Regions:
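A short, acidic, amphipathic alpha-helical segment used as a generic capping/interface helix at domain edges
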Residues: 274-290
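Alpha/beta catalytic cores of group-transfer enzymes, especially the acyltransferase/condensing modules
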Residues: 33-35, 62-64, 123-274
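NAD(P)-dependent dehydrogenase/reductase Rossmann-like domain
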Residues: 196-197, 236, 312, 321-337
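Short, solvent-exposed amphipathic alpha-helical segments in soluble enzyme
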Residues: 45-46, 170-172, 205-207, 308-311, ...
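FabD-like malonyl-/acyl-CoA
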Residues: 2-164, 215, 292-326
């Protein structure tokens, strides 16, 4: 495993002379779909050439101006899954590269669902241009796997996972209904056939869940209904070159650290129909001694989940200049204390 005090560059460029590297055990977290917003990344791209270059690389790889959609919208276009996924990946990688230029580098990486691709770019497992094209296809395949309206997802709050799983099994009635995102002790998202998910949400409320909220999603992610998408994506992923991760990546589907190229590819394939075991992944990193988590990309969803998992850990988000300077100050203070 690389020394956390040695900045690395996935494509071999050395750090700048005198680059300041914070001591301590840092994990970078990368958000998934749903965190997108019009304007994301624009300020950083205007201030940091490496962020602008990242958006330009994405534009070239995709053959259209993704940057324009991210910065100007319209929101309806940015919400299209095959645009949302490369947009969030690009924003996340731009933030990662700015942090790296500042000498703030991770010892571990993890990403929620789509964010796992961002984590692999940060770890040097995947080339950015390969990842951005692949997640465009991933979004398209997921959207096409189930006709609109036939699938659904719901967030169940304040109910233990075992009870949620039991309710899913009861509600299924020969349809698909299963835990899809095990986000925190307080939040499990379920996914499957719309009638089954609706039945499960009602059962959860009857049996004491704090809330059961139907989510405004375009497809039922991370469940067996995504099998057609999984098969199409597997064919794409198997054509890509995966390098051994330069830092371990906590994978969603197993809540284990990926430290080899072949396992990384396999985990991304299985992730399409498998649950995101986020809480377990975070507890794994905590057990490895991670002191500070940085959420690199739009929004603060993962920092919010970390507060539910372990309030004693520091989790900071970076999505614009103000949040970036807050993180820089945090590490500057940490170094001189």
């Amino acid at each position: 495993m690389p020394d956390s005090h040695l900045p690395y560059h996935p494509h071999g460029h050395p750090p700048k002379p005198g680059e300041r590297v914070p001591a301590g055990n840092i994990a970078f977290l990368f958000p998934g779909q749903g965190s997108q917003k019009v304007g994301m990344g624009k300020e950083l791209a205007e201030l940091y050439p490496v962020a602008m270059e990242t958006f330009q690389e994405a534009d070239a790889a995709l053959g259209y101006k993704l940057s324009q959609v991210c910065w100007e919208g319209p929101e309806e276009k940015l919400k299209l899954t095959e645009i949302t996924q490369p947009a969030i990946l690009t924003m996340s990688v731009a933030v990662f590269r700015v942090l790296r230029e500042m000498g703030i580098v991770p010892r571990y990486a993890a990403g929620h669902s789509l964010g796992e691709y961002s984590a692999h770019v940060a770890a040097g497992t995947l080339r950015f241009e390969d990842a951005v094209r692949t997640v465009r296809h991933r979004g398209k395949y997921m959207q096409e796997a189930v006709p609109v309206g036939q699938g659904a997802m719901a967030a169940i709050l304040g109910m233990p996972l075992a009870q949620v799983a039991q309710i899913c099994a009861q509600a299924a009635q020969h349809q698909v209904c299963q835990p899809a995102n095990i986000n925190s002790p307080d939040q499990v998202v379920i996914s499957g056939s719309a009638p089954a998910v609706e039945r499960a949400a009602e059962l959860a409320k009857e049996r004491g869940a704090k809330k059961a909220i139907m989510l405004p999603v375009s497809a039922p992610f991370h469940c067996a209904l995504m099998k057609p998408a999984q098969e199409r994506l597997a064919a794409d992923l198997k054509k890509l070159f995966f390098s051994p991760p330069e830092v371990p990546v906590a994978c969603n589907v197993d809540a284990l650290l990926m430290e080899t190229a072949d396992k990384s590819c396999d985990a991304l394939i299985r992730q399409v129909t498998g649950a995101v075991r986020w809480e377990e992944s975070m507890r794994l990193l905590i057990a490895r001694g991670v002191e500070t988590f940085l959420e690199a990309g739009p929004g603060k969803v993962l920092c919010g989940l970390m507060r539910q998992i372990d309030r004693g850990r520091t989790c900071l988000n970076v999505e614009d200049e103000a949040s970036l300077q807050k993180v820089a100050n945090h590490f500057g203070q940490a170094k001189t204390d």
